[in-house]
Amino acid sequence: DKELGFYPFITQDGKYLVLYVAKGTDPRNNIYYRKIADENGDFIKLFNKMEASYNFVFNEETTFFFVTDNDAPNKRIIAVDIRKPEKKNWQEMLSEISDPIQRVEFINHHFLVEYSHNVHSQLKIFDSAGNFVKEIKLPT
């Protein structure tokens, strides 16, 4: 398909090559991966139905963390063990709220989440289990 765009990146631990696949300007995407050490290996499908957007945040061994709008129009953070990737095995790390998630970073074992609240950005920090830690006040 000529409209498919392929965006490869390597996980922060250097163990996996992840392939983000999108079609045109559609925000929904597919995710494939393979171990870096397996140079001739095939990509493994993780999300391949173009049913939602999945944006990789980080991984801990075989658990990949994503921001997704799957069943959450304002987005949520999920953990997916690539050894058991079925939806029933997903762990929700941060539930969807009324304010949409704009961006997520994982720094020093904490999620830094930017929300859009009444057309203004809010920054909140959550621990690695998804528990609220604090809000960072932004300049006005």
Task: Spell out what each predicted region is.
Residues 1-140:
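Peripheral, non-catalytic segments that deliver or gate enzyme domains
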